Amino acid sequence: MSRLLACLKQLQARSLIHNTTLLQPSCNVNSVYLGADPTAASLHVGNLVALMPLVHFFLNGFPVFTVIGDATAQLGDPSGRSTSRKQMAETTRTANSNSIHNQLKDLSSSILSYAQDCNYPFSQMPSSSQWSIVRNSSWYENLKLLKFLSSVGPHVRVSQMLARDSVTTRLQSPSGLSFAELTYQLLQAYDYSYLYENHSVNLQIGGSDQWGNITAGTDLVRRTHPNANVYALTTPLLTSSSGQKLGKSAGNAIWLDPKLTDSYSLYQYFISAPDDLACKCLDMLTLLPLEQLEQIKAEHEKDPSQRIVHKYLASNVVRMVHGKKALELAQIQTKLLHGAHQAPFGFYSEAPQQGDSFPSLPEIRALFKDCKFYRTIDSSIKDQPFSRLLRTLQIYTSRKEATEHILSGAVSLGHKPILDSNYKFPDNSLFVLRAGKRTFVLDSL
């Protein structure tokens, strides 16, 4: 079986292909690339869907490139947006680019290790040197405007630019479309052309909302190199149960950077996902063998309440993105916060506690101190009435809101509801606070 055929079979079986431009097993794919604009300091879960085909090509021995669009980010990609992006300061864009570069570097090594754990059917064992991370500023910084227009402009038709979905949608919207946004597709097309000429890249991957930008690139390469065989592959978009795209623009991003979304929160995101989304993601976002995926889903169907699919999905994504140690920590934290049996301080355990088997408070603090939901109560606020304390700790937006939730019985400390808005948090204590569906660890030690 050819490398390309093996790779395409994986992508098709995992529902990772939304559309392609005549990409067949008989095609000659040399190198593959995926772009990422540094509009935030981290990639997010939505980016994983487009990243996974690149991973499969990498694991099948193809040279792959991730292109950080630090130059094109100055214009703003209009795809999938109803309004223009806000202009980003150069220092922020540079910091984001550095952060994503380091994240991709860590991901490439973590993914290779994870694939080996999954007994991935490598067509050819890849080398880390086959995954290159580049920035498109490296080829734009010395490119003059007239040179760009004279080399690209003659090969592009304005009618085609205006016909692309990302453009027509915005032209019909109240906010309209800026000239900078209109020309974004030209620069992404030039990225493809540059990579084709300098690195023999002839396949670009992206989300389905990138189809217009990607095919602008294949069109440009074919016009400037009539004998070129270049291809495009897009993936489905990951959407919420309401059909909303999961991305930072929608305000619901789950970040891949553990400093922004800790491993416990990433784990819990998938544990709490709707069944249909979890089953899709199990195929798309893990490297488990295809036969095992079917077995897991069949087992899940016998008793969906056990969330077997969700547990495999959460464990595999955290293992792949954050590593083994992070997964172990997330699983311990999950048992302490969501186990079957009540334990001291509002925590839980997998089995009834016996003797001194439950962790000490310093041990629990060490487990949770880096989590976003961990709150320290220092001497300056420890005597505040409970409703004010919850506002100070940013658990509620106002003291009035906190009081309303306390009086309604929606707030519990330990395993007991707190019904007094003037309650004082005890000194030298560490408790689990549950505020509606949210969980926090409060520490006054």
Curated annotation (Swiss-Prot):
Catalytic activity: tRNA(Tyr) + L-tyrosine + ATP = L-tyrosyl-tRNA(Tyr) + AMP + diphosphate + H(+)
Cellular component annotations (GO), alphabetically ordered: cytosol; mitochondrial matrix; mitochondrion
EC number in record: 6.1.1.1
Position of sequence motif 'KMSKS' region: 245-249
Localization, UniProt: Mitochondrion matrix
GO molecular function: ATP binding; RNA binding; tyrosine-tRNA ligase activity
Pfam families: tRNA-synt_1b (PF00579)
InterPro entries referenced in this protein's UniProt entry, alphabetically: aa-tRNA-synth_I_CS (IPR001412), aa-tRNA-synth_Ic (IPR002305), Rossmann-like_a/b/a_fold (IPR014729), S4_RNA-bd_sf (IPR036986), Tyr-tRNA-ligase (IPR002307), Tyr-tRNA-ligase_bac-type (IPR024088)
Keywords: Aminoacyl-tRNA synthetase, ATP-binding, Ligase, Mitochondrion, Nucleotide-binding, Protein biosynthesis, RNA-binding, Transit peptide
UniProt: ATP binding residues: D37, K248
Motif 'HIGH' region: where in chain: 38-47
Main location per the UniProt record: mitochondrion
Binding site for L-tyrosine: Y33, D77, Y184, Q188, D191, Q210
Annotated ranges, domain S4 RNA-binding: 384-445
Keyword Nucleus: no
Gene3D superfamilies (UniProt xref): HUPs, RNA-binding S4 domain, Tyrosyl-Transfer RNA Synthetase
GO biological process, one term: tyrosyl-tRNA aminoacylation
Stored PROSITE patterns: AA_TRNA_LIGASE_I, S4
Subunit note: Homodimer.
Its job: Catalyzes the attachment of tyrosine to tRNA(Tyr) in a two-step reaction: tyrosine is first activated by ATP to form Tyr-AMP and then transferred to the acceptor end of tRNA(Tyr).
Family stated for the protein in its record: Belongs to the class-I aminoacyl-tRNA synthetase family.
Protein name from the UniProt record: Tyrosine--tRNA ligase, mitochondrial
